[in-house]
C-alpha cells in the first residue's frame, strides 16, 4: 500500500517542502539539542518533584524557576535583570524591550510556553551547561 495516498494532502505538502528545501544542518543540530535537553530536564524534574516529593504540578514550576535563575546568573529577577538574561532575550526581541518581555511574559504565557521559549533561546552550550548543573544538584 502506498502510504502517501492515505496521508492528508496538507501533510504531504509539508513533507515535500522539507524534502525540496531541507533545513540547514546547524538548525537541525540546534533542534536536536533542544529536544534532548527538554526531554532530559522534564524527566529529571518529574522524578524529583512528582515521584520523590509527591508535589503534582510543581515540576514545571521549579523547572521554569531554575531556567530563569540560571539565565539571570543566579540572581532573582526581583533584584534586577543581569546581562546574561538580557543577552538571551535579545535573541528574541529588541534590546530596549527586554525588561518588558521578561516581566510581561509571566502574565500572558503559560508556564510550559515560557519553558519552551527560554530553552529555545538558549544556545546549545547554555543548554548543556544548564543540564550539567541540574544533574550535579539532583545527584547530591
Give the positions of each predicted feature.
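A detector of helix-start/N-cap boundary segments at the beginnings of structured domains
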Residues: 1-6
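Substrate-receptor adaptors of ubiquitin E3 ligases
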Residues: 26-140
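Short hydrophobic alpha-helical "box" of cullin-RING ligase substrate receptors
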Residues: 7-19
Amino acid at each position: 500500500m502506498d502510504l502517501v495516498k492515505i496521508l492528508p494532502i496538507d501533510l504531504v505538502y509539508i513533507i515535500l517542502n522539507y524534502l525540496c528545501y531541507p533545513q540547514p544542518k546547524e538548525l537541525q543540530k540546534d533542534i536536536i539539542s533542544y529536544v534532548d535537553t527538554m526531554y532530559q530536564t522534564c524527566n529529571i524534574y518529574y522524578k524529583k518533584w512528582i515521584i520523590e516529593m509527591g508535589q503534582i504540578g510543581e515540576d514545571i514550576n521549579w523547572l521554569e524557576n531554575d531556567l530563569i535563575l540560571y539565565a539571570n546568573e543566579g540572581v532573582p529577577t526581583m533584584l534586577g535583570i543581569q546581562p546574561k538574561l538580557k543577552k538571551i532575550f535579545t535573541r528574541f526581541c529588541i534590546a530596549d524591550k527586554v525588561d518588558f518581555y521578561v516581566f510581561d511574559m509571566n502574565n500572558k504565557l503559560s508556564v510550559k510556553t515560557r519553558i519552551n521559549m527560554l530553552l529555545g533561546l538558549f544556545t546549545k552550550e547554555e543548554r548543556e551547561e544548564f543540564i550539567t548543573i541540574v544533574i550535579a544538584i539532583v545527584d547530591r
